[in-house]
C-alpha cells in the first residue's frame, strides 16, 4: 500500500431527504445496474438502492463519496462536528449501516464521526484488489483536512484488524485505535505483525466465549508496545459491533471502556497536533 496520504476528491450532499446508495448487506456484492464501478465514480450518491435500515440514521449527517489513492469510490456518512473525531470501520458481513446508531451516540457526545464502506462493501465501488488500509487512510485524511485534527479509529472484527494495521501506517499517527474482536489476520492483512509499529494507544476487546477471538486479541495486544496497549476480555459470546449495539452487561462494560478511552485520548491536551494528513 502507498504510505503517502490519499488525495481526496469528494462530493457532499446534504442528507436531509437524501439517502445512501446502500443496503445493509452481509457480504460484498456488485453494485446495482447503473451504479459506478470504475475508478472514476460519479460525484455524488445515487438513489438506486436505498437501504431502509440506513435511511433514518444517514439523514442525520452528510452522505459522501470519497476517492482513495487507487481511485476507488468510498461511500461514507459524516455525523457531528468539531475538532475531535472517530472513524468507524465495519465488519465483513456488513456495511457502514451497522455503525450509524452508535455513530449518532458519539456525535451527540461531541465527536465528529465518519462511518464508511470499505471498497467492495456496501455502496463503495468493487475493486479488483481490496484496499483496506488505503480506505482507512482516506477516511482519516478527510476528517483532518476539514477541521478535525484529532482522530481515533474504531473497528469491528474485520474492521478491527484493518484499523490496527492502518493506525500503524498513518502519519502523523492517529490518537488511538480500538479493535473490537480483531482476528489476527483477515484477507492477508496481519494485525499482529503491524502492532509493534503502533505509535498510538490501542485498546483490544474480545469476548471469552466468542471462539478464539480472545486468543487473537491477546496475541495482538502482546505484540503492541507495552506502554501503548490495553486489553479487555469480557465474559460474553458477543462479537464486534454487538459490543456497542446490544443491551447486555458485557456491552455496557465495553461501551464504558470505549468512551473512557475516547475521553482520555481525544479530550486531553495532545502532545502534538497533526499538521497534515
Question: Where are the regions a protein language model picked out?
Answer:
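Bacterial signal peptide processing site
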Residues: 25-28
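Catalytic histidine neighborhood in serine/cysteine hydrolases
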Residues: 224-242
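Alpha/beta-hydrolase active-site loop
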Residues: 127-146
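Conserved alpha/beta-hydrolase
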Residues: 105-123
Amino acid at each position: 500500500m502507498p504510505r503517502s496520504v490519499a488525495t481526496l476528491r469528494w462530493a457532499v450532499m446534504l442528507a436531509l431527504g437524501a439517502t445512501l446508495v446502500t443496503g445493509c448487506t452481509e457480504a460484498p456484492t456488485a453494485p446495482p445496474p447503473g451504479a459506478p464501478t470504475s475508478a472514476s465514480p460519479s460525484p455524488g450518491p445515487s438513489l438506486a438502492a436505498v437501504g431502509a435500515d440506513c435511511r433514518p440514521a444517514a439523514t442525520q449527517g452528510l452522505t459522501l463519496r470519497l476517492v482513495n489513492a487507487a481511485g476507488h469510490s468510498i461511500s461514507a456518512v459524516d455525523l457531528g462536528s468539531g475538532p475531535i473525531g472517530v472513524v468507524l470501520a465495519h465488519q465483513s458481513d456488513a456495511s457502514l449501516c451497522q455503525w450509524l446508531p452508535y455513530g449518532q451516540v458519539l456525535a451527540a457526545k461531541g465527536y465528529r464521526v465518519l462511518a464508511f464502506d470499505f471498497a467492495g462493501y456496501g455502496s463503495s465501488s468493487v475493486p479488483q484488489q481490496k484496499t483496506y488500509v488505503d480506505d482507512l487512510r482516506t477516511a482519516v485524511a478527510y476528517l483532518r483536512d476539514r477541521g478535525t485534527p484529532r482522530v481515533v479509529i474504531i473497528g469491528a472484527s474485520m474492521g478491527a484488524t484493518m484499523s490496527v494495521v492502518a493506525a500503524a501506517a498513518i502519519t502523523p499517527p492517529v490518537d488511538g485505535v480500538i479493535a473490537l474482536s480483531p482476528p489476527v489476520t483477515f484477507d492477508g492483512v496481519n494485525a499482529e505483525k503491524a502492532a509493534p509499529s503502533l505509535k498510538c494507544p490501542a485498546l483490544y476487546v474480545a469476548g471469552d466465549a466468542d471462539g478464539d477471538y480472545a486468543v487473537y486479541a491477546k496475541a495482538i495486544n502482546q505484540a503492541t508496545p507495552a506502554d501503548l496497549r490495553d486489553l479487555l476480555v469480557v465474559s460474553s459470546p458477543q462479537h464486534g459491533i454487538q459490543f456497542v449495539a446490544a443491551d447486555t452487561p458485557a456491552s455496557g462494560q465495553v461501551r464504558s471502556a470505549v468512551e473512557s478511552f475516547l475521553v482520555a485520548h481525544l479530550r486531553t491536551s495532545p502532545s502534538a497536533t497533526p499538521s497534515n494528513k
